[in-house]
Regions:
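Short, solvent-exposed amphipathic alpha-helical segments in soluble enzyme
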Residues: 1-6, 126-133, 149-150, 154-157, ...
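Glycine-rich nucleotide/cofactor/substrate-binding loop typically near the N-terminus or early
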Residues: 1-59, 178-193, 200, 210-212
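Solvent-exposed alpha-helices and their adjacent loops that cap or buttress functional pockets
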Residues: 12-13, 74-77, 82-84, 98, ...
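General beta-strand structural signal in soluble alpha/beta enzymes
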Residues: 18-23, 64, 82-87, 113-115, ...
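Short, ordered loop/turn segments at secondary-structure junctions
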Residues: 23-26, 87-90, 116-119, 141-146, ...
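Active-site glycine-rich loop that binds ribose-phosphate moieties when present
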Residues: 67-68, 94-107, 111-132, 165-170
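Anionic-ligand binding region
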Residues: 149-177
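A C-terminal functional module that forms or caps the active site or interfaces directly
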Residues: 183-244
Protein backbone atom coordinates (compact mmCIF):
# COMPACT_ATOMS: atom_id res chain seq x y z
CA UNK A 1 0.00 0.00 0.00
CA UNK A 2 2.77 2.44 0.93
CA UNK A 3 4.55 1.75 -2.36
CA UNK A 4 1.35 2.40 -4.34
CA UNK A 5 0.85 5.70 -2.52
CA UNK A 6 4.49 6.67 -3.05
CA UNK A 7 4.24 5.90 -6.78
CA UNK A 8 1.17 8.10 -7.19
CA UNK A 9 2.95 10.93 -5.38
CA UNK A 10 6.02 10.55 -7.66
CA UNK A 11 3.76 10.85 -10.71
CA UNK A 12 2.14 14.02 -9.36
CA UNK A 13 5.52 15.54 -8.43
CA UNK A 14 6.62 15.07 -12.03
CA UNK A 15 3.69 16.96 -13.49
CA UNK A 16 1.27 14.21 -14.48
CA UNK A 17 -2.06 12.90 -13.19
CA UNK A 18 -1.77 9.59 -11.35
CA UNK A 19 -4.40 6.98 -12.23
CA UNK A 20 -3.85 3.52 -10.78
CA UNK A 21 -5.95 0.96 -12.66
CA UNK A 22 -7.81 -1.93 -11.01
CA UNK A 23 -11.17 -3.71 -10.96
CA UNK A 24 -13.18 -3.53 -7.73
CA UNK A 25 -16.32 -5.62 -7.26
CA UNK A 26 -16.68 -5.96 -11.01
CA UNK A 27 -16.23 -2.29 -11.82
CA UNK A 28 -13.19 -0.99 -13.71
CA UNK A 29 -11.53 1.96 -11.99
CA UNK A 30 -9.08 4.36 -13.61
CA UNK A 31 -7.74 6.16 -10.56
CA UNK A 32 -8.36 4.84 -7.05
CA UNK A 33 -9.48 6.45 -3.80
CA UNK A 34 -7.22 5.74 -0.77
CA UNK A 35 -9.59 3.06 0.60
CA UNK A 36 -9.76 1.38 -2.83
CA UNK A 37 -5.98 1.41 -3.11
CA UNK A 38 -5.81 -0.23 0.32
CA UNK A 39 -8.32 -2.90 -0.71
CA UNK A 40 -6.36 -3.87 -3.83
CA UNK A 41 -3.07 -3.89 -1.91
CA UNK A 42 -4.25 -5.92 1.07
CA UNK A 43 -7.36 -8.02 0.25
CA UNK A 44 -6.88 -11.78 -0.10
CA UNK A 45 -9.56 -12.34 -2.76
CA UNK A 46 -8.05 -10.08 -5.45
CA UNK A 47 -7.50 -12.06 -8.65
CA UNK A 48 -5.06 -11.36 -11.48
CA UNK A 49 -6.87 -10.27 -14.65
CA UNK A 50 -5.53 -10.31 -18.19
CA UNK A 51 -7.46 -8.60 -21.00
CA UNK A 52 -9.34 -11.85 -21.71
CA UNK A 53 -10.56 -11.98 -18.09
CA UNK A 54 -12.02 -8.47 -17.85
CA UNK A 55 -15.56 -9.34 -18.98
CA UNK A 56 -15.59 -12.40 -16.69
CA UNK A 57 -14.32 -10.42 -13.69
CA UNK A 58 -16.95 -7.74 -14.34
CA UNK A 59 -19.78 -10.28 -14.63
CA UNK A 60 -18.73 -12.21 -11.51
CA UNK A 61 -18.29 -8.93 -9.58
CA UNK A 62 -14.71 -9.84 -8.64
CA UNK A 63 -11.87 -7.53 -7.64
CA UNK A 64 -8.71 -7.76 -9.71
CA UNK A 65 -5.24 -6.40 -10.20
CA UNK A 66 -4.61 -5.96 -13.93
CA UNK A 67 -1.78 -7.42 -16.00
CA UNK A 68 0.07 -5.34 -18.60
CA UNK A 69 -2.40 -6.47 -21.29
CA UNK A 70 -5.48 -5.48 -19.28
CA UNK A 71 -3.90 -2.24 -18.04
CA UNK A 72 -2.91 -1.22 -21.58
CA UNK A 73 -6.43 -1.93 -22.85
CA UNK A 74 -8.16 0.00 -20.06
CA UNK A 75 -5.70 2.90 -20.18
CA UNK A 76 -6.21 3.26 -23.93
CA UNK A 77 -10.02 3.18 -23.55
CA UNK A 78 -9.68 5.93 -20.93
CA UNK A 79 -7.67 8.10 -23.34
CA UNK A 80 -4.35 7.71 -21.56
CA UNK A 81 -1.20 7.80 -23.67
CA UNK A 82 1.41 6.49 -21.21
CA UNK A 83 1.58 3.94 -18.42
CA UNK A 84 4.28 2.45 -16.23
CA UNK A 85 4.70 -1.13 -15.12
CA UNK A 86 7.50 -3.22 -13.59
CA UNK A 87 8.34 -5.84 -16.19
CA UNK A 88 6.60 -7.10 -19.31
CA UNK A 89 5.35 -10.63 -19.84
CA UNK A 90 6.72 -12.56 -22.78
CA UNK A 91 7.66 -15.95 -24.17
CA UNK A 92 8.32 -18.66 -21.59
CA UNK A 93 11.53 -20.63 -21.63
CA UNK A 94 11.53 -23.80 -23.72
CA UNK A 95 7.80 -23.59 -24.49
CA UNK A 96 7.28 -21.77 -27.76
CA UNK A 97 3.49 -21.73 -27.47
CA UNK A 98 3.44 -20.46 -23.91
CA UNK A 99 3.32 -16.70 -24.37
CA UNK A 100 1.94 -13.89 -22.27
CA UNK A 101 -1.16 -12.08 -23.52
CA UNK A 102 0.89 -8.92 -22.91
CA UNK A 103 2.51 -9.47 -26.32
CA UNK A 104 -0.79 -9.46 -28.23
CA UNK A 105 -1.96 -6.40 -26.30
CA UNK A 106 1.26 -4.57 -27.17
CA UNK A 107 0.71 -5.48 -30.83
CA UNK A 108 -2.70 -3.79 -31.04
CA UNK A 109 -2.85 -1.06 -28.39
CA UNK A 110 -1.49 2.42 -29.20
CA UNK A 111 0.10 3.40 -25.90
CA UNK A 112 3.58 4.10 -24.49
CA UNK A 113 4.65 1.47 -21.95
CA UNK A 114 7.59 2.08 -19.61
CA UNK A 115 9.10 -1.07 -18.11
CA UNK A 116 12.40 -2.49 -16.89
CA UNK A 117 12.38 -4.91 -19.82
CA UNK A 118 10.96 -8.41 -19.55
CA UNK A 119 11.39 -10.55 -16.48
CA UNK A 120 14.64 -12.46 -16.74
CA UNK A 121 12.81 -15.70 -15.89
CA UNK A 122 11.40 -15.62 -19.45
CA UNK A 123 13.00 -16.27 -22.85
CA UNK A 124 14.18 -12.71 -23.48
CA UNK A 125 15.47 -13.31 -27.02
CA UNK A 126 12.25 -14.97 -28.18
CA UNK A 127 10.21 -12.17 -26.58
CA UNK A 128 12.17 -9.50 -28.46
CA UNK A 129 11.69 -11.47 -31.70
CA UNK A 130 7.93 -11.52 -31.12
CA UNK A 131 7.85 -7.79 -30.45
CA UNK A 132 9.73 -7.24 -33.71
CA UNK A 133 7.26 -9.46 -35.59
CA UNK A 134 4.39 -7.45 -34.12
CA UNK A 135 6.07 -4.17 -35.22
CA UNK A 136 6.35 -2.95 -31.62
CA UNK A 137 9.24 -0.47 -31.32
CA UNK A 138 11.46 -0.97 -28.27
CA UNK A 139 13.49 2.07 -27.20
CA UNK A 140 16.25 1.93 -24.61
CA UNK A 141 16.23 4.97 -22.31
CA UNK A 142 19.85 6.11 -22.08
CA UNK A 143 20.99 2.60 -23.02
CA UNK A 144 21.26 0.35 -26.07
CA UNK A 145 21.09 -2.77 -23.91
CA UNK A 146 17.75 -4.41 -23.22
CA UNK A 147 17.28 -4.81 -19.45
CA UNK A 148 16.14 -8.05 -17.83
CA UNK A 149 14.11 -6.62 -14.95
CA UNK A 150 16.35 -7.68 -12.04
CA UNK A 151 19.42 -7.06 -14.22
CA UNK A 152 20.44 -4.03 -16.27
CA UNK A 153 21.70 -6.32 -19.05
CA UNK A 154 19.61 -9.20 -20.41
CA UNK A 155 22.34 -10.09 -22.88
CA UNK A 156 20.49 -8.51 -25.82
CA UNK A 157 21.10 -5.16 -27.51
CA UNK A 158 18.55 -2.72 -28.89
CA UNK A 159 18.50 -0.94 -32.24
CA UNK A 160 17.41 2.38 -30.76
CA UNK A 161 18.67 4.38 -27.79
CA UNK A 162 16.88 7.57 -26.73
CA UNK A 163 18.52 10.02 -24.36
CA UNK A 164 15.67 12.39 -23.45
CA UNK A 165 11.93 12.38 -22.85
CA UNK A 166 11.60 15.00 -25.60
CA UNK A 167 13.01 12.50 -28.10
CA UNK A 168 10.43 9.95 -26.98
CA UNK A 169 7.65 12.52 -27.34
CA UNK A 170 8.86 13.36 -30.85
CA UNK A 171 8.85 9.69 -31.86
CA UNK A 172 5.34 9.38 -30.38
CA UNK A 173 4.19 12.33 -32.48
CA UNK A 174 5.91 11.05 -35.64
CA UNK A 175 4.17 7.68 -35.23
CA UNK A 176 0.83 9.48 -35.18
CA UNK A 177 1.67 11.52 -38.27
CA UNK A 178 2.87 8.44 -40.17
CA UNK A 179 -0.03 6.33 -38.85
CA UNK A 180 2.34 3.66 -37.53
CA UNK A 181 0.91 4.03 -34.04
CA UNK A 182 -1.49 1.09 -34.01
CA UNK A 183 0.92 -0.80 -31.74
CA UNK A 184 2.37 0.06 -28.36
CA UNK A 185 5.76 1.73 -28.02
CA UNK A 186 7.93 0.15 -25.34
CA UNK A 187 10.46 2.26 -23.44
CA UNK A 188 12.98 0.09 -21.60
CA UNK A 189 14.23 1.76 -18.42
CA UNK A 190 16.87 -0.33 -16.58
CA UNK A 191 16.59 -0.97 -12.85
CA UNK A 192 18.40 1.79 -10.89
CA UNK A 193 20.36 -0.77 -8.83
CA UNK A 194 20.40 -4.28 -10.22
CA UNK A 195 20.51 -7.58 -8.34
CA UNK A 196 23.92 -9.19 -7.92
CA UNK A 197 24.24 -11.17 -11.20
CA UNK A 198 25.68 -14.25 -9.46
CA UNK A 199 22.81 -14.31 -6.96
CA UNK A 200 20.33 -13.82 -9.81
CA UNK A 201 21.72 -16.69 -11.88
CA UNK A 202 21.80 -19.01 -8.86
CA UNK A 203 18.19 -18.24 -7.92
CA UNK A 204 17.02 -18.64 -11.52
CA UNK A 205 18.69 -22.04 -11.91
CA UNK A 206 17.32 -23.25 -8.56
CA UNK A 207 13.85 -21.83 -9.25
CA UNK A 208 13.58 -23.51 -12.67
CA UNK A 209 14.71 -26.78 -11.10
CA UNK A 210 12.01 -26.47 -8.41
CA UNK A 211 9.42 -25.79 -11.14
CA UNK A 212 10.22 -29.13 -12.76
CA UNK A 213 10.28 -30.98 -9.43
CA UNK A 214 6.88 -29.60 -8.42
CA UNK A 215 5.45 -29.93 -11.96
CA UNK A 216 4.56 -26.24 -12.13
CA UNK A 217 3.37 -25.39 -15.67
CA UNK A 218 1.56 -22.75 -17.74
CA UNK A 219 0.63 -19.44 -16.21
CA UNK A 220 1.62 -20.71 -12.75
CA UNK A 221 5.33 -20.64 -13.71
CA UNK A 222 5.88 -16.87 -13.55
CA UNK A 223 4.29 -16.27 -10.12
CA UNK A 224 6.07 -19.39 -8.80
CA UNK A 225 9.48 -18.13 -9.94
CA UNK A 226 8.84 -14.58 -8.75
CA UNK A 227 7.85 -15.93 -5.34
CA UNK A 228 10.97 -18.13 -5.33
CA UNK A 229 13.12 -15.04 -5.97
CA UNK A 230 11.24 -13.14 -3.28
CA UNK A 231 11.61 -15.90 -0.68
CA UNK A 232 15.27 -16.68 -1.32
CA UNK A 233 16.94 -13.33 -2.02
CA UNK A 234 16.93 -11.87 1.52
CA UNK A 235 14.77 -8.94 0.44
CA UNK A 236 16.79 -8.11 -2.70
CA UNK A 237 13.95 -9.04 -5.04
CA UNK A 238 11.43 -6.85 -3.20
CA UNK A 239 13.87 -3.91 -3.01
CA UNK A 240 14.47 -4.02 -6.76
CA UNK A 241 10.75 -4.35 -7.51
CA UNK A 242 10.01 -1.22 -5.51
CA UNK A 243 12.88 0.77 -7.04
CA UNK A 244 11.81 -0.26 -10.54
CA UNK A 245 8.18 0.77 -10.25
CA UNK A 246 9.14 4.12 -8.68
CA UNK A 247 11.75 4.80 -11.37
CA UNK A 248 9.35 3.81 -14.16
CA UNK A 249 6.52 5.91 -12.74
CA UNK A 250 8.80 8.96 -12.67
CA UNK A 251 9.90 8.44 -16.28
CA UNK A 252 6.31 7.79 -17.41
CA UNK A 253 5.16 11.06 -15.85
CA UNK A 254 7.98 12.97 -17.53
CA UNK A 255 7.15 11.39 -20.91
CA UNK A 256 3.44 12.19 -20.50
CA UNK A 257 4.38 15.77 -19.67
CA UNK A 258 6.60 16.01 -22.77
CA UNK A 259 3.90 14.53 -25.03
CA UNK A 260 1.30 16.99 -23.72
CA UNK A 261 3.51 19.90 -24.81
CA UNK A 262 3.84 18.72 -28.43
Amino acid sequence: LQVAQDVEEIVRQNGAAAATIAVIAGKVHVGLEPDQLELIANANDVVKASVRDLAIVQTLKQSAATTVSATAHIAHLAGMKVFATGGLGGVHRGQNYDESADLIALSNTPIVVISAGVKSILDVGATLERLETFAVPVLGFKTNIFPGFYLKDSGFTLDTQVDSVDQIAEIFQARQELQTNNTAMVVANPAPNQMNPELHDKLLTQGLSECKKQNVTGKAVTPFLLEYFHSNSNGESLRINIEIIKSNAKLAAQIAQAISKK
